[in-house]
C-alpha cells in the first residue's frame, strides 16, 4: 500500500493502527517468552543511537524479538554526550546493565540511500560523509566516558542503507562489513568477518551481535525477492 499517497487522515489512522499492532505483539505471551529465551542465550545489552526517521527499524531489519534492542533517538541521529540529560540517560542505562552483569554493545548509526541521496538523512542535508563523521565523534565520546578498553562498553559505527535495510559496519582503519554485498550463503563466515573487523571485541559480545547480522542477511534477501 502506498501510504504516502493517501490523505493525511488516512495516514494518521494507518500510523495508529501500526502502533496498536506493535503494542499487541510486544505484550503477547509469545513475544515475552521469545525475549526471555533470547536474553538467556544472548545476554549482551544492545543499545542503538539512531535518527528519528521511522525507516531505521533495527529489530525489524535484523529479525530480533521486540524489546531486545534499546533505542536512543534524536533528529538526524545527532547526539552529544555533553548534553546533561542524554549523558544521564546513557550512563544510567549502562550502569543498570553492568549491575546485572551484562556487557553493553552501543551501535551508533547513520543512514543513507544508494538509490537517491535525497532519501538519506535530511538532518545532515543528505550528506552521508558528514553523518558518518558525526557518528565517529559520538563513538569517541563514548570511549572517553566509558573507556578505551572496550571490555564492558563496546561502541561501533554502523551505516543503515534504507533502500534495502542493509547494515554497513565500520571497523578501524577504513575496514567495513557491508551486508548488502553478502548473501545468505555467507552467513557461516560472519563470525570470522566480525573477528577481523573487531579483534578486541569480547567473544560474548561478538556471539550476541551475530544473530542480528544473520537476521539482516535474511531480511535483505526477502526484500530483493
Which residue ranges define each predicted feature?
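A generic secondary-structure signal marking the coil-to-beta-strand transition
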Residues: 44-45, 68
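Short, conserved beta-strand edge motifs with alternating hydrophobic and charged residues
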Residues: 49, 106-110
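Catalytic core of membrane glycerolipid acyltransferases/transacylases, capturing the structured
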Residues: 50-78
Amino acid at each position: 500500500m502506498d501510504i504516502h499517497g493517501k490523505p493525511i487522515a488516512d495516514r494518521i489512522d494507518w500510523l495508529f493502527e501500526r502502533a496498536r499492532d506493535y503494542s499487541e505483539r510486544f505484550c503477547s505471551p509469545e513475544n515475552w517468552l521469545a525475549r526471555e529465551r533470547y536474553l538467556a542465550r544472548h545476554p549482551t545489552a544492545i543499545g542503538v543511537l539512531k535518527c528519528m526517521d521511522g525507516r531505521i527499524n533495527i529489530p525489524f531489519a535484523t529479525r530480533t524479538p521486540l524489546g531486545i534492542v534499546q533505542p536512543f533517538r534524536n533528529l538526524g541521529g545527532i547526539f552529544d554526550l555533553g548534553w546533561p540529560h542524554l549523558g544521564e540517560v546513557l550512563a544510567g542505562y549502562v550502569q543498570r546493565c553492568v549491575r546485572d552483569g551484562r556487557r553493553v554493545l552501543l551501535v551508533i548509526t547513520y543512514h543513507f540511500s544508494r538509490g537517491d541521496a535525497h532519501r538519506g538523512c535530511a538532518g545532515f542535508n543528505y550528506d552521508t560523509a558528514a553523518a558518518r563523521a558525526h557518528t565517529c565523534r559520538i563513538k569517541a565520546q563514548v570511549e572517553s566516558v566509558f573507556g578505551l578498553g572496550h571490555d564492558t562498553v563496546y561502541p561501533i559505527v554502523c551505516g543503515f542503507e534504507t533502500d534495502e535495510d542493509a547494515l554497513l559496519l565500520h571497523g578501524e582503519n577504513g575496514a567495513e562489513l557491508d551486508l548488502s554485498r553478502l548473501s545468505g550463503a555467507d552467513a557461516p563466515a560472519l563470525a570470522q568477518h566480525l573477528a577481523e573487523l573487531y579483534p578486541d571485541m569480547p567473544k560474548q559480545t561478538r556471539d550476541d551481535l551475530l544473530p542480528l547480522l544473520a537476521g539482516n542477511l535474511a531480511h535483505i534477501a526477502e526484500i530483493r525477492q
